Amino acid sequence: MLENIDTSLIDWSRAQFALTAIYHWIFVPLTLGLAVIMGIMETVYYRTGDKFWKHTAKFWMKLFGINFAIGVATGLILEFEFGTNWSNYSWFVGDIFGAPLAIEGILAFFMEATFIAVMFFGWDKVSKRFHLASTWLTGLGATISAWWILVANAWMQNPVGMEFNPDTARNEMVDFWAVATSPMAVNKFFHSVLSGWVLAAVFVVGVSCWYLWKNREKKFALASIKIAAWVGLCAAVLSAWTGDGSGYQVAQKQPMKLAAMEGYYQGQEGAGLVAFGILNPDKKTADDGKDAFLFRMEIPKFLSLLAERDSKAFVPGINDLLKGGYPLKDGTTALSAQEKIEKGKTAIGAFSAYRAAKAAGNDAEAQVAAKVLKENVAYFGYGYIKDVNELVPNVPLTFYMFRVMVILGGYFILFFIVVLVLAYKKDLSQMRWMHWVAMLTIPLGYLAGQAGWVVAECGRQPWAIQDMLPTSAAISKLDVGSVQTTFFIFLVLFTVMLIAEVGIMLKAIRKGPEKEPSHQS
């Protein structure tokens, strides 16, 4: 059946999922970060009783609510697409992938839904303590939601805690905690959530600088800037640290992705990390003999240090990963891509033989087939690969997006330091150049987050589940025209929703925060 699937169906299914995910991630990080910033502001109000902080928190809550509503809508569509466009994937790993999503829906979403109502409508109706708890629990619910979604995504990057059941043709969970607490999941969670805090901090600083540029709400703007910049600086530094941890996990579990991130074709000991480079557009395949770069600047030995925590360690490149033959940590020798493909075909053949023997009631043949399947099941997904070059992701896209993310991450650290120095040491309200810098930094926060996800998802192609299920085998057998139609429907729908959100937010920003009374209470 899979041989008859039109490649354009694969491309359009991927495009539709990417479209939904990109739009969804426009809203999620701002929700995660604003929850922390407005929680801190309300905590100050609770401790001081100064209603200025109450009105400050309420203003950012209003923007949080607008953003939260659109994020939920896009998230629901994203989850439904697993069943509509990726039914083979859903069947193959539904027992594992469904568990985190179910927990996210039952626990996190209902926590958010319960306490967000108190947060918005409970002012002066419940005690200040309970309202503060509701605000923080709303943010906690959003963060828990992110945890389980990212656990599911991390499992796709590094499938653990499961085994293949040939009787059901499914991968089934055998160790929930291995799935929930894998190092890949932990690093991905902290890196993604902290990047959301950075984006929200950039957003708050940028909006507040707009007020200063307009010579409005000076007290409100400066107070918001100071809190947001501290949150942003801490998050940006920690995000860089967790990014290092994520890089190490990628090197261990997805070496081809790491090689694509670096445009790294020929492995070596003491490998350097490319700080900046221009790829050779004429290089099309790993073995075409052409140089990978037109120009590059390297940090010596840094890639080995990142990937193996040893500046002298060998790091395999794309050619090494395709040809194999290099020593592994366990003392064995790496298989070539072609050898993995042959083992994958053996696994698929053994699975078919097992099902046929079971259907015929031949237990002896079934046991033999099951043994062969168990020996080769780790390479099951490779059996669907037709050419070794399919195992190489889009190198230019992965390489450049990785550098966009890293460069912007460094810029944000510098940005928050400058903002804090000016806010505490100078009169930031008079520095119109800084107002423009802050406002123009807002879209860069969104760009950094999207670039990170492009690296994570495009860098792991051709796999829907690393080494187990290629994207080409994960899709539903649909009519290409129907996928194209829904793609453009979603494109229009999401664009309208985005325009509506931006319009409502701009209206709320132009209106500004409520005026606090002149006295404290």
Regions found by a protein language model. Give the residues of each.
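Polytopic transmembrane helical bundles with strong interfacial aromatic enrichment
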Residues: M1-S521
